[in-house]
């Protein structure tokens, strides 16, 4: 099957509210229309995942940010220019069009542009942002090949786009841009050092928040939240 036909069929599944395993550079994602509450519900059901867990929206490029996010800071575009497409998810304020079911009840949403040309083409063709957690049953290892997805999820989803093995093999790095300084929420495929180099200062959350700046020498401890 030619790529154009495969892309069209995959996009149609997403538009119709179906579940589609899609390749990215990190791990395979379980994709659905992120604006369709029923489709999003099917993600949680297929994975056995709690519905209060936020999902990441995947888009083909940074120009889509203002469709789904409010008050997008200049920092987001700077990071996108430097690291997108790539394993970086940015937390931003969501617009009302993004359902709370997608964001786990939060007024913020994670946005990512995957570094996989076929998946970006599918999203572009579908014309909707794709909510896509890892394509595996909750509690099992993330899948890095289409065969792994087939073994775990077959019978629960409507299709698998085989894009070969994932290059990175770990989830995306997540940074919250709704706070100052930006805060690392999850380490992943993009190293923390790259974010510090781009932003100058990043807060890292653990039991006590550690603030790192670009000198790599200055560390200040902040009170942890309750």
Model-derived features: where do they sit?
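Active-site-adjacent structural elements in enzyme catalytic cores
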Residues: 1-211, 217-218, 224
């Amino acid at each position: 099957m030619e790529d154009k036909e495969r892309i069209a069929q995959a996009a149609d599944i997403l538009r119709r509210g179906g579940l589609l395993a899609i390749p990215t550079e990190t791990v395979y994602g379980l994709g659905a229309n992120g604006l369709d509450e029923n489709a999003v519900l099917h993600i949680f059901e297929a994975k056995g995942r709690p519905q209060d867990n936020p999902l990441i929206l995947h888009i083909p490029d940074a120009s889509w940010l203002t469709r789904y996010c409010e008050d997008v800071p200049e920092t987001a575009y700077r990071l996108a220019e430097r690291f997108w497409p790539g394993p970086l998810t940015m937390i931003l304020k969501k617009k009302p069009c993004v359902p709370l079911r997608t964001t786990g009840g939060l007024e913020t949403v994670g946005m990512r542009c995957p570094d996989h040309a076929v998946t970006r083409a599918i999203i572009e063709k579908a014309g909707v942002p794709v909510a896509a957690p890892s394509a595996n049953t909750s509690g099992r290892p993330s899948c890095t090949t289409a065969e792994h997805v087939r073994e775990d999820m077959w019978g629960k989803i409507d299709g698998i786009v085989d894009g070969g093995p994932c290059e990175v093999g770990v989830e995306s790095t997540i940074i919250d841009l709704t706070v100052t300084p930006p805060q690392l929420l999850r380490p992943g495929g993009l190293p923390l050092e790259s974010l510090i180099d781009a932003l100058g200062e990043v807060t890292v959350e653990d039991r006590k928040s550690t603030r790192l700046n670009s000198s790599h020498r200055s560390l200040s401890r902040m009170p942890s939240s309750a």
